């Protein structure tokens, strides 16, 4: 139960921070391009790289700290960071084909799922 609470707590903080970054980007850059989403995804990817190296590899941090910061905080801030870490991990293990398939499938199927979701809801409207 404590693990779920840690994920929820980290996720709440990450989600609120994502909201503020999005609002900041909207005020700074305007709404013609999704600058907020781009910023969160890039920053989240950098931070998950830092966390993965420091927490998981250098300091052998507890499962609870990993759940709080990586699954919770970064999961709430951006799930794109988890996708990116998974892809890089495949390449680092020498599984380039699997990494390429994972990237193509993740992007392609995710875009297709959004299109399908939009189509279903538009058909029901």
Swiss-Prot record:
GO term, biological process aspect, one: cellular detoxification of fluoride
UniProt cross-references to InterPro entries, sorted A to Z: FluC
Activity regulation summary: Na(+) is not transported, but it plays an essential structural role and its presence is essential for fluoride channel function.
Parts of the chain that traverse the membrane: 1-21, 32-52, 68-88, 101-121
Topology class, membrane: Multi-pass membrane protein
Gene Ontology MF terms: fluoride channel activity; metal ion binding
Catalytic reaction list: fluoride(in) = fluoride(out)
Family: Belongs to the fluoride channel Fluc/FEX (TC 1.A.43) family.
Name of this protein: Fluoride-specific ion channel FluC
Organism the protein comes from: Rhizobium johnstonii (strain DSM 114642 / LMG 32736 / 3841)
Chain's gene name: fluC
């Amino acid at each position: 139960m404590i693990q779920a609470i840690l994920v929820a707590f980290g996720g709440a903080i990450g989600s609120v921070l994502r909201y503020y970054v999005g609002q900041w980007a909207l005020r700074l850059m305007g709404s013609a391009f999704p600058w907020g989403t781009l910023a969160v995804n890039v920053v989240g990817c950098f931070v998950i790289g830092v966390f993965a190296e420091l927490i998981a590899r250098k300091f052998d941090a507890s499962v609870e700290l990993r759940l709080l910061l990586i699954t919770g905080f970064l999961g709430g801030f951006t799930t794109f960071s988890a996708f990116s870490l998974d892809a890089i991990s495949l390449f680092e293990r020498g599984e380039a084909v699997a990494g390429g398939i994972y990237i193509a499938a993740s992007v392609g199927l995710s875009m297709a799922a959004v299109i399908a979701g939009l189509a279903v809801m538009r058909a029901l409207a």
